[in-house]
Amino acid sequence: MVSYKARISLSGTEHRVVDRVCNEIKEIASRTGVEIHGPMPLPTKRLVVPVRKSPDGEGTNTWDHWEMRIHKRLIDVDADERTLRQLMRIPIPDGVQIEIQIKS
């Protein structure tokens, strides 16, 4: 049977949802008996947008700061075709982006 190395990178704005998908991937890997490394948390990217509170530009300069955090996880899986097929069937929530790189 052919074995592949898959690198799965997950990113999303809510860390609990990203961790839930990571746990599903870990469960599939343990059920099929393949080796897994991770999830490795990558640095959280913090995006801040300062916006003026006053719509007309008059008065004192008061600002609102809107923030969005992007959480990332990285998982390496030594998988066979059956495991990869099961990984493709995982329901991914709307707020999570997933990228799978496969090396043979």
Swiss-Prot record:
Gene3D superfamilies: Ribosomal protein S10 domain (3.30.70.600). The keyword Electron transport does not apply. Keywords: Ribonucleoprotein, Ribosomal protein. One of its GO terms (molecular function) is tRNA binding. One of its GO terms (cellular component) is small ribosomal subunit. It comes from the Archaea. Signal peptide: none annotated. InterPro entries: Ribosomal_uS10, Ribosomal_uS10_CS, Ribosomal_uS10_dom, Ribosomal_uS10_dom_sf, Ribosomal_uS10_euk/arc. GO terms for biological process: translation. Belongs to the universal ribosomal protein uS10 family. Involved in the binding of tRNA to the ribosomes. PANTHER family: 30S RIBOSOMAL PROTEIN S10 FAMILY MEMBER. Part of the 30S ribosomal subunit. This is Small ribosomal subunit protein uS10. The gene is rps10.
